[in-house]
């Protein structure tokens, strides 16, 4: 089964995808790669344990302000960062990662996550909910690192963030990037559309649009039938590659500069 990230990887360079996914070659680990994996791990642990916060009924009451909720989440995040770093001491030492710098980057990248959640918690508390009922009735509810799978599409993925608004009966997938983006690139469009399709199947309701949150820029993508067909065609094209084992060249050969797979790519033509 393909992963959503496989689709964007194939779009970037079919040959890189071929060597990674079909031949089984691996890129050498680098400091940025390890830092990225640690950031994703923090987000994953954050998402998996967020509901447990609301079991402490005494900590959440009708007098809890957004500022206090924000502090509540910040302390929660800080504990998770320490936990992930403690469990990854070997990698951190091997790749000479500055823990304090990475900690600040993670906190910065999670600022909006915490802000959105704090606003939602404050508004739901005002409706009289506390504790577990508060979690169950949060609206809008933001869920990070949500695993999704579709047997019919042959596709799976983990959405960076989704927003569920029960009042408006709306579900919105978000793709988060650290870089600013002037526009939605084809790879972003494929990822956003893929997550929308996976969510439509999971929740059995239409997903009209998705959002790319890239650095300080926000772009909205309307999910059309044409977008969906592009995803289906791409899935079929990639599945065909597993049979033919004849990958296409990238659309732009500037991508070949400093590519780890250059030697393997040249030997493929022999």
Feature-to-residue mapping (PLM):
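An acidic intrinsically disordered interaction segment
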Residues: 3-10, 148-167, 224-232
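Glycine- and acidic
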Residues: 175-181
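Charged, glycine-rich intrinsically disordered N-terminal tails and low-complexity linkers that flank
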Residues: 1-93, 135-137
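Short amphipathic alpha-helical face segments that pack within enzyme cores
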Residues: 38, 190-198
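Metal-dependent nuclease catalytic regions and adjoining charged, substrate-binding loops involved
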Residues: 151-154, 182-186, 198-270
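Catalytic cores of nuclease domains that cleave nucleic-acid phosphodiester backbones
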Residues: 62-175
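Short alpha-helix boundary/capping segments
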Residues: 30-31, 183-190
């Amino acid at each position: 089964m393909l992963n959503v990230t496989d689709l964007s990887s194939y779009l970037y360079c079919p040959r890189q995808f071929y060597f990674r996914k079909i031949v089984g070659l691996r890129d050498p680990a680098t400091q940025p790669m390890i830092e990225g994996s640690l950031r994703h791990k923090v987000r994953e642990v954050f998402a998996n344990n967020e509901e447990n916060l609301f079991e402490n009924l005494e900590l959440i009451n009708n007098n809890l302000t957004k500022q206090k909720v924000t502090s509540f989440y910040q302390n929660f995040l800080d504990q998770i960062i320490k936990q992930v770093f403690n469990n990854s001491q070997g990698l951190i030492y091997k790749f000479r990662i500055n823990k304090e710098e990475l900690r600040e980057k993670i906190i910065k990248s999670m600022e909006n996550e915490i802000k959105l959640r704090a606003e939602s918690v404050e508004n739901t508390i005002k409706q009289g909910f506390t504790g577990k009922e508060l979690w169950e009735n949060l609206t809008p509810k933001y869920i990070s690192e949500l695993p999704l799978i579709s047997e019919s599409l042959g596709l799976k993925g983990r959405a960076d963030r989704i927003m569920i608004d029960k009042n408006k009966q709306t579900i919105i997938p978000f793709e988060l990037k650290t870089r600013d983006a002037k526009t939605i690139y084809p790879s972003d469009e494929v990822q956003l559309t893929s997550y929308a399709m996976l969510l439509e199947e999971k929740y059995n309701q239409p997903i009209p649009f998705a959002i790319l949150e890239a650095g300080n820029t926000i772009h909205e993508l309307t999910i059309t039938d044409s977008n969906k067909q592009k995803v289906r065609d791409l899935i079929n094209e990639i599945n065909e590659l597993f049979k033919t084992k004849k990958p296409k060249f990238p659309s732009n050969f500037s991508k070949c500069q400093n590519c780890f797979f250059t030697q393997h790519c040249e030997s493929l033509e022999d």
